[in-house]
Amino acid sequence: MTGKEDNDACVLHDKSLKLVLKSRSIVIAGEITKDVSRLFQEKILLLEALDFKKPIFVYIDSEGGDIDAGFAIFNMIRFVKPKVFTVGVGLVASAAALIFLAAKLENRFSLPFARYLLHQPLSGFKGVATDIEIYTNELNKVKKELNNIISKETGQKISKIEKDTDRDFWLDSSAAKKYGLVFEVVETKYQLEEFISA
């Protein structure tokens, strides 16, 4: 990067941070990585420190990604004092669906054309047989944890969750509401604010 590019990046970061602080909103878009998780944790802790009585909004449009990074974001949403609202705005898939479920049911909203994907954790692991066996056992534990969270947060029986997540399970916003993923589908910020203030 040139000096000008560095400066432009800093200015953009400053503007982005000011917008986060003013709106108390965090956007999770694209692949969920360790870096995305770290930045999210920094922002949510900063918002908590500034005013723990005001809510925080998390807008999600993500194909998923690193499940451990997803769990870290999930944990932080539940850890902080402010009430956190999650809003599905586009694709909410895999680890992103886990993050979406970190908010209480009454704090989970969807825009009309958001889509949701639940499935078992994916593995691209390669190695010797014993390492593969160890990794498979760990992956099965993660799968069980995910299914338990989905069951608890949606009210669906664990047997149904296990069946549904065995393969890719797609839901549009209205189906996600019926399933218990989403509390309400809203079209505008005004509608969201009405539900929050009710």
From Swiss-Prot:
InterPro entries in UniProt: ClpP (IPR001907), ClpP/crotonase-like_dom_sf (IPR029045), ClpP/TepA (IPR023562), ClpP_His_AS (IPR033135)
Instruction: Point out the coiled-coil segments of this chain.
Output: none
Question: Where does the UniProt annotation locate this protein?
Answer: Cytoplasm
Q: What is this protein called?
A: ATP-dependent Clp protease proteolytic subunit 2
Q: List the PANTHER family.
A: ATP-DEPENDENT CLP PROTEASE PROTEOLYTIC SUBUNIT
Tell me the active site.
94, 119
User: Which is one Gene Ontology cellular component term of this protein?
Assistant: endopeptidase Clp complex
